[in-house]
A protein has these predicted regions:
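Short, isolated positions in well-ordered beta-strands
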Residues: 42, 94-95
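Short strand-turn-strand beta-turns centered on an Asx-Gly dipeptide
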Residues: 89-92
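Intrinsic-disorder/low-complexity, polar/charged segments enriched in Ser/Thr/Lys/Arg/Asp/Glu/Gln
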Residues: 52-54, 62-66, 107
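Secretory targeting signatures
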Residues: 1-27, 87, 126
Length: 126
């Protein structure tokens, strides 16, 4: 049985798309621009239901996480105006944090204490 060349090309293209697309989505998700002092980031997890980014860390000492959040992934706005993210450490809302805002992303600095292991950043949309 000889396959039609057009059908063969379509099969190859579909297979290639299936390999490429998951890695593109994983790259967007895994490649947050961040730095951490006093610990290590273990994983990032998006919670679409609660419009939040969950961050698991291993906090070995008092430190801080500086993370750049692309607006295409998570943002906090009321209408067209920026509003503050709600930031939680182990379920307790952080009263203040430093933030730098650009048209494309928002960079926030979250201080943490030793043994804090769970951070969440809640926006208004993802």
């Amino acid at each position: 049985m000889i396959l039609n060349p057009v059908l063969l090309i379509v099969i190859v293209v579909v297979a290639m798309i299936g390999v490429i697309i998951p890695s593109v989505f994983a790259q967007q998700f895994e490649d947050f621009d961040y730095s951490i002092r006093g610990g290590e980031v273990l994983k990032f997890e998006l919670d679409l239901d609660n419009t939040s980014l969950l961050i698991s860390i291993d906090a070995r000492a008092r430190g801080e996480l500086i993370i750049t959040l692309p607006r295409a992934i998570i943002d906090a706005k009321i209408g067209s105006e920026d509003t503050a993210f709600d930031v939680f450490i182990r379920g307790m809302q952080l009263s203040s944090y430093e933030e730098t805002i650009t048209p494309y992303d928002r960079t926030i600095t979250i201080p943490f204490k030793r043994s804090n292991d769970e951070l969440s950043i809640v926006g208004t949309h993802m």
